């Protein structure tokens, strides 16, 4: 254990967060996301909710200030989003500073970004459209 680092952050996740450079992206996915077929490094965080992990990492993680740092998947036509999912994520991310806007992109564009991500963290999140991409910024 380390002081001031949440016990929700595994050693593997801490290492990945430290190795990421500015502009690198990481996905925190729901339990249904096809992470293992996407290609990048996959970290398991079974049983944890995305919002809890976001709240744990945000004190350690600088969001990009030059490009939209938060991206979520848009609902497929005919499907509906649960607005409480985004609200919960925004609340978790605003623990350190005001939360930037979250951009929504279509499912296949999100999958393309996921294939190029530095890592994907699979959580136990069950919320539909519960995946979020974070783009790392420059630490001041």
Swiss-Prot record:
The active site lies at: 22 (proton donor)
Q: Which GO molecular function annotation, any one, does this entry have? A: fucose binding
Per its record, the protein catalyses:
alpha-L-fucose = beta-L-fucose
Q: Which residues bind substrate?
A: 30, 107, 129-131
Q: Name one Pfam family in it.
A: RbsD_FucU
Q: What is its EC number?
A: 5.1.3.29
Return one Gene Ontology term, BP aspect. Answer: fucosylation
Q: Where does it live in the cell?
A: Cytoplasm
Q: Give an example GO cellular component term for this record.
A: cytoplasm
Give the keywords, sorted: Carbohydrate metabolism, Cytoplasm, Fucose metabolism, Isomerase
Q: What is its main location?
A: cytoplasm
What does the annotation say about its assembly with partners?
Answer: Homodecamer.
Question: Which function does this protein serve?
Answer: Involved in the anomeric conversion of L-fucose.
Similarity comment text for this entry: Belongs to the RbsD / FucU family. FucU mutarotase subfamily.
Record protein name field: L-fucose mutarotase
Q: Which organism is the protein's source?
A: Klebsiella pneumoniae (strain 342)
């Amino acid at each position: 254990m380390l002081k001031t680092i949440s016990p929700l952050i595994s050693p593997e996740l801490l290492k990945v967060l430290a190795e990421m450079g500015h502009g690198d992206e990481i996905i925190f996915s729901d339990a249904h996301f096809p992470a293992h077929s996407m290609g990048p490094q996959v970290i398991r965080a079974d049983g944890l909710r995305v919002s809890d992990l976001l709240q744990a990492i945000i004190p350690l993680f600088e969001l990009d200030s030059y490009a939209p740092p938060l991206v979520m998947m848009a609902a497929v036509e005919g499907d509906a989003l649960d607005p409480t999912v985004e609200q919960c994520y925004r609340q978790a991310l605003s623990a350190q500073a005001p939360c930037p806007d979250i951009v929504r992109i279509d499912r296949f564009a999100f999958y393309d970004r996921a294939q190029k991500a530095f890592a994907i963290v699979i959580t136990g999140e069950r919320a539909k459209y519960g995946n979020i991409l974070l783009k790392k910024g420059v630490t001041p």
